[in-house]
Amino acid sequence: MQVENLRQPENQVSSPVLEVSDLSVAYGKVEALSNASLRVGQGQIVTVIGPNGAGKTTLLSAIMGVLGSRGRVAFDGSLEAVPEVEVMVARGLGLVPEKRELFGSMTVADNLLLGAFQRHRSGKRDHADTLDEVYTLFPRLKERRDQMAATLSGGERQMLAVGRALMAKPKLLMLDEPSLGLAPLITREIFRIISTLRQQGVSILLVEQNARAALRVADYAYVLETGQIAMQGPAAQLADDPRVIEAYLGLASKHQEMLAG
């Protein structure tokens, strides 16, 4: 069920860490993303919810520079005329993709340190404090720090992917479906960690099909459908909106509610 497309005021933040304006992506004659605009404020968690095929991953890929796009992307106060992956990473944009890109033949600790090295280009000693911070967030990773990443469970690999992104101390962390395919216990743990990051002032753009869990942790939310922003507003307000309840929080999402705890 689609949500009615309504024009609503933008996310009002004085100095957004990310501002996307009229972003569009086309595959041939098919427009996968159409004039999408959003903002993420400093220390804010913003979520984008929507069904499969809505264009959520396309949106993140275009912001990151993985896909060619039309529109405007301003990150950390600077306009990126043509976003490029290497430039965005160097400037502090972190992405945890839906398909976790880990090095199975490397230890958990070395995978984490690689995340810091990709941005800061320095040695292990320079990142010891950051490594301890990540281990505090993810005790499981500390317990398994000397194991090969290939031996981890799916949930542990997701924790490692998030931890590796945090090692780079990103100015904005983008999470693409972090709970996808995870067991209920691990899903609750992932969202607990997201809530903790919010308390620590980490800016996050969260793309998530589990609308109920996403709206619980977010400050502001966008509903993306068929490549367009259909609705937006404070997350608590959208969670109470009858149209969102019917489309995303009704009986069809009871399973998601169980996963979110």
Q: What annotation goes with each model-predicted range?
A:
Residues 2-261:
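Glycine-rich phosphate-binding loops of nucleotide-dependent enzymes
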